[in-house]
């Protein structure tokens, strides 16, 4: 009885998988049966299945043991059992990369590939191409060409799919099969036509003109395969995204015509392609949306799901285009498939009116606990978008989100809710206290370190400015008592911010920080000691520098500079100005990296760090000092011209390095000694040009021009440069790429390049602008008033000022409240050379906009530059 029970228990539990407890050594021992005569197909099949199972489970096979098993398996070709033979093909494909001398089966596979048994031919082709390398491919080329045009569809498809894989090994050989692939593309079999189109596209994808011709041919002649139509639509949409013709192109007409295809798959692919095209207008979207609207009432759940998911994406950018589908979407709210119902509601949240929000939120509440975390995140994202659209509904959203926060769920789900509440708190001052209260409640029982530290950071930033800041201290100090080291350290930093901004709370905060100095963790003790000493000085400037605003430098850059400093001992103190500035605030960099991977990882170098390293490797630029700022690329040629050139401006303390990324788009020319000659205006001085040695067809190259900034007038920071690309041309054969021996000099005029005031200023966020304003002081303060007569709204004025100066808006002052006639804009940045620069701009709307600008810095030059450029 006991034995019977054990067996039954084993079958119902983990023992239900017959291969679960396989041992590699035992299976390899069993494989010796392959050498027995006569062959037992049933037993051999079972052993091959075990080998494939082990390989797919990630079991490591040594080269010797894999080769031994492989050679034993080759004897099974003597059997005529169909199932066993096809299992051999599978095993060959799996063991091709781990066994030696696999080419021993080439003759057997070639025999099967050209034999009369159609059931063997397709799998034999796939197995043969898996073991073939570039040197052997020519030996089977004749057979492959025949197979591609074979009348048996499974053989032709196998040959075409294998050709796609062989392109990675020997593109030139496969290119010779293009005529056969074109013949296969006219096949009546839907899969053969689809695979043939795939081969033709991949052979031509680097030649835009050839792809366009292919598309033109197939769109005119038509196709039998719905799969091939889907692929054509994808190719056409890819070309459309790169094209300048946009939606006037015949390609767009082709995609639109596919909306009337008889196959639902093709109709959906066309609708999806139109929706994902950039810069689509509501009128161009209308036919695609109409098709998706019909799919919403389809009896097939897959079609309903596809339609509502795609409409959900459209609603993000074009909510008005989806409004016509609202009735159909409302019918889907009660769909038996919860995924469809969720997407329907979230789409309605994006397209519905303010009055429908309460009703929709009530409907979501009824089933939100039944859906997966993935769809809960979609709901939260929709609510977040709704908060931006209808800020007055924040209280309804906040209540709903706080209830969701209490439910069970994974990290991504909780993170989405926390991010949404944080954005509501930051966008709506009246919701601040309610949002902070919900987050305080959440961190009392939060198992995610990343979220706890993020919330503590927010409490430190927003809590001190609330009417009763003391009520948050208990929640923060509880973290010091109850949590892990990372959360305790974040809590100490948050406490310090309360002490720095609230004089009445300072004595209590000092006591709490003294307790934190007894912590078991070094980081927590160090932070507590540091903040305690700073706060005891009771100086606003110190608080601003070391508590509110923190580091504004690149972390990888600082790590490298400190390492270099330790390698070369010096009596001079370490200079923080030698480190490139961070492109984003340090805390944002940190949180983003941490959210991606919970494990501590090294910060990835930023774009600016990479540029710094590249420029430092060039001898002429070694002594320019730290890279201050790199601009976004500026295009200096039209897209379809002979040469494509764009420029990145690298700003140093006293110099600018212009980096020209050049591409030669002519296949009958090789350019050599490529430089860009610059004629500056005013007092800029061109020091040297570093050429790109050669520019072969379609291969990008880089040349540089070094320019010294004006000495006499430091405020003359803006200027225009005329640019001419000079080079030596060597004509070459377009087919072989071999250039002529002799060349001739030529030049190409580029568009003018402007250096603006924003190129000299790096954005830096000051979380507490008032403290930073006091810290900089009024030693070099200047104030002027300007009339912006051509500007009609405060929003336009704010956007123009931010864009022109290239500075970072602080305290969310880039958002202008509704129905206001005046507004204050706070901007922060660092001027070239490492000088903090703050701008306070008071705007008033009357006949145009009047602007009073106050500028502060610790040096005179940045202040003069700002006022001179604005004036």
From Swiss-Prot:
The organism's taxonomic lineage, starting at the top: Eukaryota, Metazoa, Chordata, Craniata, Vertebrata
Pfam family, one: COP-gamma_platf
Basic and acidic residues composition-biased segments: 1-11
Key words of the record: Cytoplasm, Cytoplasmic vesicle, ER-Golgi transport, Golgi apparatus, Membrane, Phosphoprotein, Protein transport, Repeat, Transport
Assembly mode: Oligomeric complex. Binds to CDC42. Interacts with JAGN1. Interacts with TMED10 (via cytoplasmic domain).
GO BP, one annotated term: intra-Golgi vesicle-mediated transport
Organism in which the protein naturally occurs: Mus musculus
Residues recorded as bearing Phosphothreonine in the entry: 594
GO molecular function: structural molecule activity
GO CC annotation: COPI vesicle coat; COPI-coated vesicle; cytosol; Golgi membrane; growth cone
Family: Belongs to the COPG family.
Keyword Transcription regulation tagged: no
Designated name of the protein: Coatomer subunit gamma-2
SUPFAM superfamilies recorded: ARM repeat, Clathrin adaptor appendage domain, Subdomain of clathrin and coatomer appendage domain
Protein's cellular compartments: Cytoplasm, Cytosol; Golgi apparatus membrane; Cytoplasmic vesicle, COPI-coated vesicle membrane
Gene: Copg2
HEAT repeat positions: 64-101, 283-320, 321-355, 356-392, 395-430, 467-504
Region span, Disordered: 1-20
UniProt topology in membrane: Peripheral membrane protein
InterPro entries: ARM-like (IPR011989), ARM-type_fold (IPR016024), Clathrin/coatomer_adapt-like_N (IPR002553), Clathrin_app_Ig-like_sf (IPR013041), Coatomer/calthrin_app_sub_C (IPR009028), Coatomer_g_Cpla (IPR032154), Coatomer_gsu (IPR017106), Coatomer_gsu_app_Ig-like_dom (IPR013040)
Function (record text): The coatomer is a cytosolic protein complex that binds to dilysine motifs and reversibly associates with Golgi non-clathrin-coated vesicles, which further mediate biosynthetic protein transport from the ER, via the Golgi up to the trans Golgi network. Coatomer complex is required for budding from Golgi membranes, and is essential for the retrograde Golgi-to-ER transport of dilysine-tagged proteins.
């Amino acid at each position: 009885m006991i034995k019977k029970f054990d067996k039954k228990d084993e079958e119902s539990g983990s023992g239900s998988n017959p291969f679960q407890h396989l041992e590699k050594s035992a299976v390899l021992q069993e494989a010796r049966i392959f050498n027995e005569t006569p062959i037992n197909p049933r037993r051999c099949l079972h052993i091959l299945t075990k080998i494939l199972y082990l390989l797919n489970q990630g079991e490591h096979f040594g080269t010797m043991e894999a080769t031994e098993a492989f050679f034993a398996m080759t004897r099974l070709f003597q059997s005529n059992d169909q199932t066993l033979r096809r299992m051999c093909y599978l095993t060959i494909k799996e063991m091709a990369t781990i066994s030696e001398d696999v080419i021993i089966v080439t003759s057997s596979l070639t025999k099967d590939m050209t034999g009369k048994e159609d059931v063997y031919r397709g799998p034999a082709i796939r197995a043969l191409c898996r073991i073939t390398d570039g040197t052997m491919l020519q030996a089977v080329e004749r057979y492959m060409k025949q197979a591609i045009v074979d009348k048996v569809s499974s053989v032709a498809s196998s040959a075409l799919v294998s050709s796609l894989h062989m392109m990675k090994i020997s593109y030139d050989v496969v290119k010779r099969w293009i005529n056969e692939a074109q013949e296969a593309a006219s096949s009546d079999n839907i899969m053969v036509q689809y695979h043939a189109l795939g081969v033709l596209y991949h052979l031509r994808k680097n030649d835009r003109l050839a792809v366009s011709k292919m598309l033109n041919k197939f769109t005119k002649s038509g196709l039998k395969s719905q799969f091939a139509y889907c692929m054509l639509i994808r190719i056409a949409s890819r070309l459309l995204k790169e094209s300048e013709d946009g939606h006037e192109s015949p390609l767009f007409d082709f995609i639109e015509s596919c909306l009337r295809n008889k196959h639902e798959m093709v109709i959906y692919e066309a609708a999806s392609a139109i929706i994902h095209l950039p810069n689509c207008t509501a009128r161009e979207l209308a036919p695609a949306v109409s098709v998706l609207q019909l799919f919403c009432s389809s009896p097939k759940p897959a079609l309903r799901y596809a339609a509502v998911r795609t409409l959900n994406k459209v609603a993000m950018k074009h909510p008005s285009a989806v409004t016509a589908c609202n009735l159909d979407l409302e019918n889907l709210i009660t769909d038996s498939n919860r995924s469809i119902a969720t997407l329907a509601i979230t789409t309605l949240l994006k397209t519905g009116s303010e009055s429908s929000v309460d009703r929709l939120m009530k409907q979501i509440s009824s089933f939100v606990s039944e859906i997966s975390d993935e769809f809960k995140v979609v709901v939260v994202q929709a609510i977040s978008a709704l908060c931006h659209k209808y800020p007055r509904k924040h209280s309804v959203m906040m209540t709903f989100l706080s209830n969701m926060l209490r439910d069970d769920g994974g990290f991504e789900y909780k993170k989405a809710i926390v991010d949404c509440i944080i954005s509501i708190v930051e966008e709506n001052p009246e919701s601040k206290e309610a949002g902070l209260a919900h987050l305080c409640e959440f961190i009392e029982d939060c198992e995610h370190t990343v979220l706890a530290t993020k919330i503590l950071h927010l409490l430190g930033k927003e809590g001190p400015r609330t009417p009763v800041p003391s009520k948050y201290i208990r929640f923060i100090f509880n973290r010091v008592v109850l949590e892990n080291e990372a959360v305790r350290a974040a809590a100490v930093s948050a406490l310090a911010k309360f002490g720095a901004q609230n004089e009445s709370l300072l004595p209590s905060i000092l006591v709490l920080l003294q307790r934190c100095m007894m912590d078991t963790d070094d980081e927590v003790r160090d932070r507590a000691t540091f903040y305690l000493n700073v706060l005891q000085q009771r100086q606003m400037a110190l608080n601003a520098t070391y508590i509110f605003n923190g580091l504004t430098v690149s972390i990888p850059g600082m790590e490298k500079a400190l390492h270099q400093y330790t390698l070369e001992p010096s009596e001079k103190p370490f200079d923080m100005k030698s480190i490139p500035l961070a492109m984003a605030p340090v805390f944002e960099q940190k949180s983003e990296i941490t959210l991606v991977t919970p494990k501590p990882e090294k910060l990835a170098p930023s774009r600016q760090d990479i540029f710094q390293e590249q420029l430092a490797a060039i001898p002429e630029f070694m002594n320019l000092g730290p890279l201050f700022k790199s601009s976004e690329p500026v295009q200096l040629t039209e897209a379809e011209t002979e040469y494509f050139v764009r420029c990145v401006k690298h700003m140093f303390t006293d110099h600018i390095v212009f980096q020209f990324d050049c591409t030669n788009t002519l296949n009958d020319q090789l350019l050599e000694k490529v430089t860009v000659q610059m004629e500056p205006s005013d007092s800029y001085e061109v020091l040297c040009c570093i050429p790109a040695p050669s520019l072969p067809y379609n291969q990008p190259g880089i040349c540089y021009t070094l320019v010294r900034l004006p000495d006499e007038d430091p405020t003359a920071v803006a200027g225009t440069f005329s640019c001419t690309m000079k080079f030596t041309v060597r004509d070459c054969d377009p087919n072989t790429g071999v250039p002529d021996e002799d060349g001739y000099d030529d030049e190409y005029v580029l568009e003018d390049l402007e250096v603006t005031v924003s190129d000299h200023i790096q954005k830096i966020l000051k979380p507490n602008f008032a403290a930073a304003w006091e810290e900089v002081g009024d030693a070099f303060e200047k104030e002027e008033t300007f009339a912006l007569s051509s500007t009609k709204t405060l929003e336009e004025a704010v956007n123009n000022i931010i864009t022109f100066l290239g500075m970072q808006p602080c305290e969310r002052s880039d958002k202008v409240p509704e129905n206001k006639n005046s507004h204050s804009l706070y901007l922060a940045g660092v001027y070239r050379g490492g000088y903090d620069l703050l701008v306070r701009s008071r705007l008033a709307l009357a006949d145009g906009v009047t602007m009073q600008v106050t500028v502060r810095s610790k040096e005179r030059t940045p202040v003069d530059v700002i006022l001179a450029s604005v004036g």
